A protein has these predicted regions:
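Active-site-adjacent beta-strand/loop module that shapes the phosphate/pyrophosphate-binding cleft
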Residues: 67-92, 98, 102, 113-124
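Charged phosphate-binding loop/patch that engages nucleotide di/tri-phosphates or the phosphate backbone
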Residues: 118-150
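Conserved hydrophobic "DFG−1" position in protein kinase catalytic cores
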Residues: 10-11, 19, 80, 99
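A short coil-to-beta-strand element that immediately follows conserved catalytic motifs
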Residues: 55-64
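Conserved Nudix-box catalytic region and its N-terminal flanking loop in Nudix hydrolases
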Residues: 12-51
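Residues at secondary-structure transition points
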Residues: 36-40, 94, 108
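Conserved N-terminal beta-strand and adjoining loop/helix that marks the start
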Residues: 1-17
Length: 150
């Protein structure tokens, strides 16, 4: 059975994207996380944004579903906006928050996030993508799964 995740691309008025720094690995990521049993991907995305950032979010479009068969992982990616709340920069899962230009994404990001963000920039809507993980970041992800940190 595939693990389900839900993540949100949220832009501010300056067209900057909201990123969170993870506590489990020193990488930047989109706000999001695991879909709980009985919860829709949309509900999980909104909940995870609040838990990780302190912000309330409203979803406006589904960018797509990204499947990683090697890891039995399926990630739902949404576009949304921040509708309220107060930033929480240091939470249970999050070591920091920042708004960055879509053209100047950090070097150290969770595997495949830049690809997902580029799909968004190129106008992708409701796509289905099968991703093949490569390199060191994929190895980190596999190690985390084996250690039960996901």
């Amino acid at each position: 059975m595939y693990t389900q995740g839900a993540f949100v691309i949220a832009l501010n008025e300056s067209q900057q994207i909201l990123l969170v720094k993870r506590k489990d690995v020193p990488l930047w990521d989109l706000p999001g996380g695991r879909v709980d049993p009985g919860e829709s991907a949309e509900e999980a995305a909104v909940r995870e944004v609040l838990e990780e950032t302190g912000y309330n979010a409203a979803l406006s479009a589904k960018i797509g579903v990204y499947q990683r068969p090697k890891f039995q992982d399926e990630q739902h990616l949404f576009f949304g906006s921040i509708t309220g709340g107060q930033a929480v920069a240091d939470g249970i899962e999050t070591a920091g928050l920042k708004w960055v230009s879509l053209e100047r994404l950090p070097l150290f990001m969770v595997p495949n996030r830049k690809r997902q963000i580029n799909d968004f920039k190129n106008g992708a809507q409701d796509v289905n993508v099968t991703v093949k993980d490569r390199g060191l970041l994929a190895a980190i992800d596999l190690l985390k799964r084996r250690l039960g940190k996901r």
